[in-house]
Every structure is written in C-alpha cells, then in structure tokens.
Design a protein with these regions (language model features):
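Conserved ABC ATPase "signature" region
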Residues: 128-147, 341-344, 399-416
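Short, glycine/charged-rich "phosphate-handling" switch motifs in NTP-dependent
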Residues: 225, 237, 494, 506
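A short, proline-enriched helix->beta-strand linker immediately N-terminal to the Walker B motif
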Residues: 171-175, 440-444
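Charged, flexible cofactor/metal-binding loops and thiol motifs
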Residues: 3, 74, 146, 240-280, ...
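ABC ATPase NBD Q-loop/coupling interface
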Residues: 65-87, 125, 196, 337-359, ...
C-alpha cells in the first residue's frame, strides 16, 4: 500500500546559491508519526513548508517529487497549480506553527477565524461552522468553548493559543497534519499536555503527523519514524526504536550527547548549609495592580555557588531576578542584601544612593535569554564589549581594547572577531558575546535569565559548559533562572521551584530529583521529555501538579487563595505543605 505522503529527492534553493535542502527523501503512512529532527538551519522546516508550497519568496523547489495520496489519486504537490493547491491546504493537509500569535489574527475573534476554514472547504453555513468549531474546541481541551469562540488571540495563554491553532488545523479533519516545533515556545507542563492532545487526536482520527523538532525527548514520546537532518541533508533515518535505541550517524550521536536529561540521583549525603552569602532576598513581594507576581520569597545565594529558580511563565522567577539586581523595587518590607566579601557589611540593594548603585552594578551583572537584548546590531563587538568600561570610566582606550580581547578569549572566541557586527554570528556565538559583555567589569555575581532556552541542544550544552568553566576560573556566584529542571540539575547547587509567585519546594538538585514532595515539582519532572522510548511522559502526574493550587492534594492545597507555609520537611529540604 503506498504511503500517504512521499517526498523524493527534494532540493530547495535560494536564487543561484547552493541548495539549502539537498536530495531529501522521506515518507509517512496514514496514522503514523514521522519526526524530522535537526538543529536550526538543518532544512527541516523548509522541507515541510515545501509540502504546502509556502516557501519564502526567494526560495524555489529545484527538483524532486512531493506525492500525496488523495482519495485514491497520486497528486504531485510540487507541480500542482496554485488554485488546486488552495483546495488541499487546510483540508487534506494542515500545518501548525511554533508561534501561534503569528498565525492567529489579533483583530478577529478566534472562533470566526476557525469557522473560515470550514466555510472555505466545506459547504456549510456560518451557524453550522460555529457548531463544529465549538465541538472542536471542546475536543482540544477548552473548558468554556463559547468563551473561547468569542475571545481574541491575545486574551489566551500560550498553551491555549496553541490549542486554538490545533483546532484550526484539525477542524476540517485533514489526512495529514504538519506540526512545526509546536511546543518549543511552551512551558514544560503545557508542552506535555499539547503532545498528549496531538496523540489523542491522531488516535481518534487516524491522521498522519509530521513533527518538526530539535528535541529528541519529544521524538521519543511521539514518533514512529525518525529522519535526522543537518545542513540540508538527511543524516540518518529509520524507526524510532532503531534511531533512538542505536544511533549510527555521528551527528545523531552528538544530538543525544547534548540532549538535556534529568539524572536519576541517589539520595544525597546531607551537606551543611553555607554561612556566607553574596546575595539574599528577604520577604520579597511584588504586586502589579491586583496581580501578586512575587509573594514572600526568601532565598540566599552562597558565595561561589549556583542557586537556580525554576518555574513556568508567570511563576515570578524573572521578577525575582530583576528585583535582585535592583532593576525593580520590591514592595515595602522586602529586602535584597548583597555582600561583596565575607568581611564586608551587607548593603540593601533596594535602598542605594545613585553612587552606591553605580558601584553595585559593577559587581552584579545579568545575562539575558535573547542575546539581541544585550547586543546592539549597530555596534561592532569591540564597542559592545568596551561600552561598560567606558560608562564606568575603567581604563584607557588601549586597556579597554586589551580587556575586550581578553573577554573574547575567556568565552572561547577569537580576537579577529572584534570588528564584526552581531548579525555575523550564530546564536551560540552571540550568547558567548553576551556573557563576555556581562564579565567586562569583573563582577562577583551573574544573574542568568534563561541563558540557554533559545539555543539548539548542542549549543545549549556548550553554553552550560562555558558558564561552569567561568564560574570555577573566576570564582563567580550565579542566580540562574530557568523553566527546565534538566538544565538546572546540571549546573545548580540548590534549586527553588516557584509557582504563581511562591516558592513551593527548595533543595539541592540531588535531593529534589531523588525525593520530590510537592505535586508541582513532580509535574515538572514528569513533563520533561526524555530521549528514551522507555521513559514516556507521565500525563497523569503532569495534570495533577500543573492544575490550580486549590485542586492539589489536601496536604498542599491552597484554601481561598491562602497557601500553606513553607516548612523544613527534612534537613535542607523546604516544602510548602500543611503537613
């Protein structure tokens, strides 16, 4: 029996340049999931966009076949007229994208946008379309379909936006769904729920799924067949059991080595708490109008150590980072203390004079999630690295240039790059440059806000290696912000898990992973996709911990919005619980 979709020797190029996708072949059967795996620039997204012929204007299909089995006929989508192709897009073949806000109009109600799919491809009235859309909303997990129908995209959370995109793509019951990094921009528990939803829809409808991803953990949980791509070519392909169980190509092995996993720790030997701290948040609260973003956070960073705050969007972790650096003020009664050395007196970051703040900013710096936030596209690298020195009047022009060269060497880059602009560098190189800029003033503390989340897995591993190396060589302390427990398990000495502005559990990563107590911590661990087909995501655990705090088990439940206290459940292990 022929495959539902067969792509053979597909070659795509831009202008007269060499091919960006070169002789790529793959196929997917009805009811099957095919994963296209690779890092940024591998050609996986371009290959899938070619199926629906939604390539960038300057790109064209140079050769190859894209054959779709449609109602008993073979249709070569690469050569189909635009008029006939419009009848297939959204009907027989649908696609969902990484960022739903780019696909959902903010000017039109969600229900009207999805109804349009049915009025275009089905002979039905708006009233009939609405009923089908409401049924699809309920199917994809909206608790109140009528409200979702009337909502605008910006009124929904990221997870709900992606559910709306899935509803739009599946409402016409396509034979093939292409999902391009559908969960990359989502929190861990939301990602797990969306992956579970896709599997459920596929099982019920029998549709085929092409899943584009860079995450081998997602592949292990979803795929029947795997195609690994790099630089526009297929490196390896086969069943998920074969490719994930015994990868043959060096590039596939490299992806596996770089994939973040939550280690299986033994219960650790008890360690004494460090008495000396460099940073300490005391009873920190922050409200924005009626929203309590941070509520009673107490957290200290021991000198020379890494303390991580883990949580999902809206947990308050980034607000804590900004308050720690004095970029935002905590509510009255909250304090942030900084100690330059064990012998020095602590200063309150929240009440510094302008001169004191200027001095503090030399000693505490931030590394951002997106290096574009800290590197001006109009500045050469030498200017970006010497600007902090110039602002704080450090050294002569020659000394600043020497410092810039030294900084590049510290982050593993070459001095020949000084006269380049940021757009000449890869994402990983730009993050190295951001770290170099943060180190320019020889700080004692780095606050790292999701420094690896925007990077491919192999580059992510390199940046974590760099941060560990710099910490050891320069005796730095880190406050490390992340949504990924696998990342912090690797780098942190202590982890605080936040949910809706409160710390719900705090311990060493070894203790937290070996003996998690809070349902939300367990949900974060369960939601992390492991690159192992024998360790699937536990959706029941995810649903239990990711729900509303008032629905948690009795020992952890909030009552009328009032949280249980954060107690020392055992030595060096804090849990927010009534028990």
């Amino acid at each position: 029996m022929p495959s539902l979709l067969s792509v053979k020797d597909l070659t795509i190029g831009f202008g007269k340049n060499k091919p960006t996708v070169d002789q790529v072949s793959f196929s997917v059967d009805a009811g099957e999931t095919l994963a296209l795996v690779g890092e940024s620039g591998s050609g996986k997204t371009l290959s899938c966009r070619a199926i629906l012929r939604i390539l960038p204007n300057s790109a064209d299909i140079r050769s190859g076949e894209i054959v779709l089995q449609s109602r008993g006929n073979d249709i070569d989508l690469a050569r189909l007229s635009e008029r006939k192709l419009r009848g297939i897009r959204g009907d027989r073949v649908s696609m969902i994208f990484q960022e739903p806000m780019r696909s959902l109009s903010p000017l039109h109600r969600i229900g009207h946008q999805i109804s349009e799919v049915l009025t275009l491809h089905r002979d039905c009235s708006m009233a009939e379309a609405k009923q089908q859309v409401l049924a699809e909303f309920e199917h994809v997990g909206f608790n109140d379909p009528e409200r979702a129908y009337r909502a605008y995209s910006f009124e929904l959370s990221g997870g709900m936006q992606q559910r709306a995109m899935i509803a739009m793509a599946t409402v016409a019951k396509p034979a093939l769904l292409i999902a391009d990094e559908p969960t990359t921009a989502l929190d861990m528990t939301t990602q797990a729920q969306v992956l579970g939803l896709l599997k459920k829809l596929q099982a019920e409808s029998g549709m085929a799924l092409i899943l584009v991803t860079h995450d081998l953990g997602v592949v292990a949980n979803m795929a029947d067949q795997v195609v690994v791509m790099n630089k526009g070519r297929v490196m390896e392909s086969g069943s998920s059991n074969l490719v994930l169980g015994a990868p043959a190509h060096p590039y596939t092995k490299k992806l596996f080595q770089a994939a973040p996993v939550i280690p299986e720790f033994e219960r650790p030997v008890e360690q004494p708490k460090a008495a000396d701290f460099i940073l300490s948040l005391r009873d920190v609260r922050k409200t924005y109008g009626a929203i309590q973003a941070v509520d009673g956070v107490n957290l200290s960073v021991p000198r020379g150590k890494v303390v991580a705050i883990v949580g999902e969007s809206g947990s308050g972790k980034s607000t804590c980072a900004r308050i720690a650096l004095g970029a935002e003020l905590a509510n009255p009664g909250g304090h942030v203390f900084f100690k330059e050395s064990p012998e020095a007196d602590a200063i309150d970051v929240q009440s510094l004079s302008p001169a004191e703040r200027n001095d503090f900013q030399r000693k505490a710096q931030m590394v951002f999630q997106d290096p574009h936030s800290s590197l001006s596209p109009r500045m050469q690298i030498i200017d970006a690295l010497t600007e902090p020195l110039d602002i704080h009047s450090v050294g002569t022009v020659a000394e600043r240039r020497d410092r810039a060269i030294e900084l590049l060497e510290q982050v593993g880059l070459d001095s020949s790059m000084l006269r380049r602009y940021p757009n000449a560098f890869s994402g990983g190189q730009r993050q190295r440059l951001s770290i170099a800029r943060a180190l320019a003033l020889r700080p004692l503390l780095l606050v790292c806000d999701e420094p690896t989340s925007a990077l491919d897995v192999s580059v992510q591993a390199q940046i974590l290696d760099l941060l560990e190396d710099i910490r050891d060589r320069l005796n730095l302390s880190y406050l490390f912000i992340s949504h990924d427990l696998a990342v912090v398990a690797r780098i942190a000495d202590e982890v605080a898990v936040m949910r809706r502005g409160r710390v719900v559990e705090q311990a060493s990563p070894e203790l937290l992973m070996a003996n998690p107590k809070h349902p939300y911590t367990r949900a974060l661990i369960a939601a992390h996709p492991e690159p192992d087909i024998h360790r699937p995501i536990n959706l029941e655990t995810v649903a239990l911990g990711a729900g509303d705090p008032e629905s948690w088990p009795d020992a952890f439940r909030y009552t009328d919005g009032v949280a249980p206290p954060l107690i020392e459940y055992e030595s060096n292990h804090l849990v927010r619980t009534h028990v």
